[in-house]
Amino acid sequence: MSDLPDTDFTQRFIFDDRDIRGEWVALDDSYAAVLARHAYPQPVATLLGELMAATSLLVGALKFDGLLILQARSAGPIPLLMVECSGERDIRGMARYEADQIAADATLAQLMPDGHLTLTIDPVKGQRYQGTVELDGKNLSECFTNYFVQSQQLNTRFWLNAEGGKARGLLLQQLPVDRQRDEEEREDSWQHVIALANTLKPQEWAEANETLLHRLYHEDAVRLFDIQPLRFKCSCSRERSGNALVSLGEQDAKQLVEECGGKVEIDCQFCNERYFFDASDVAQLFAGGGTDTASETRH
């Protein structure tokens, strides 16, 4: 097998002789783009990378047109981790943290005590779905596995890794009865693929996906599907920032500009882009003129 040149993608695979499917994700450039915009401490960067990998795996597995949002919240040193990924596989992520409370060797329970994980699916068509569970696990891989134990009948396991500026993830899921109808045989198959995935070593995560999957499952009939590219893309814009000002009402928007010394700044928490609006910009907004794309923005 040849190594794939792509750096950011998901790839689905199935076991031809077993009722099991998998999904692999690799995030290099998109993860690097998120980290380049924020000086996250390593424990925060690691958790955010793992959450990006998990979000990508779910988008690849669910196949929908819309937006998938994952939020992990707590009252601890990391009050928020948030990742959004669209059906077109545009991904962005951010974190809020208390820098003086982040220990390099802190566990998930110490960084996000009494935390909750919320999954939101906002489809272009259809009903919005949201589910919340406790962050129940020693790491995010266990938390996502436990989430699916509570919400689905099908066995599902996650493996997540974010080290060396690369985020990776593996999802395995048992499918409804088809090829294997004997319950004991199904359980043996599931334990077989799980046991092999558990042999993954930290240094192996950076390898090409085809190489790694072949090493794990070379004795099984595994069929890989086409890769689906991912990219970092922030959905913020000057127009959206202007709409936020309009939502305040004309009087409050003008007052805000005055209180800010003649120019209000709206920052994107995902990509750190800053949008500035002065009195003339606000007047133009409420006159129905929209936003001037030539006005000042900064990274």
Curated annotation (Swiss-Prot):
<keyword id="KW-0862">Zinc</keyword>
<dbReference type="GO" id="GO:0044183">
    <property type="term" value="F:protein folding chaperone"/>
</dbReference>
<feature type="disulfide bond" description="Redox-active">
    <location>
        <begin position="234"/>
        <end position="236"/>
    </location>
</feature>
<dbReference type="Pfam" id="PF01430">
    <property type="entry name" value="HSP33"/>
</dbReference>
<keyword id="KW-0143">Chaperone</keyword>
<protein>
    <recommendedName>
        <fullName>33 kDa chaperonin</fullName>
    </recommendedName>
</protein>
<keyword id="KW-0676">Redox-active center</keyword>
<dbReference type="InterPro" id="IPR016153">
    <property type="entry name" value="Heat_shock_Hsp33_N"/>
</dbReference>
<dbReference type="InterPro" id="IPR016154">
    <property type="entry name" value="Heat_shock_Hsp33_C"/>
</dbReference>
<comment type="similarity">
    <text>Belongs to the HSP33 family.</text>
</comment>
<feature type="disulfide bond" description="Redox-active">
    <location>
        <begin position="268"/>
        <end position="271"/>
    </location>
</feature>
<comment type="function">
    <text>Redox regulated molecular chaperone. Protects both thermally unfolding and oxidatively damaged proteins from irreversible aggregation. Plays an important role in the bacterial defense system toward oxidative stress.</text>
</comment>
<dbReference type="GO" id="GO:0042026">
    <property type="term" value="P:protein refolding"/>
</dbReference>
<keyword id="KW-0963">Cytoplasm</keyword>
<dbReference type="InterPro" id="IPR023212">
    <property type="entry name" value="Hsp33_helix_hairpin_bin_dom_sf"/>
</dbReference>
<dbReference type="InterPro" id="IPR000397">
    <property type="entry name" value="Heat_shock_Hsp33"/>
</dbReference>
<dbReference type="GO" id="GO:0051082">
    <property type="term" value="F:unfolded protein binding"/>
</dbReference>
<keyword id="KW-1015">Disulfide bond</keyword>
<dbReference type="GO" id="GO:0005737">
    <property type="term" value="C:cytoplasm"/>
</dbReference>
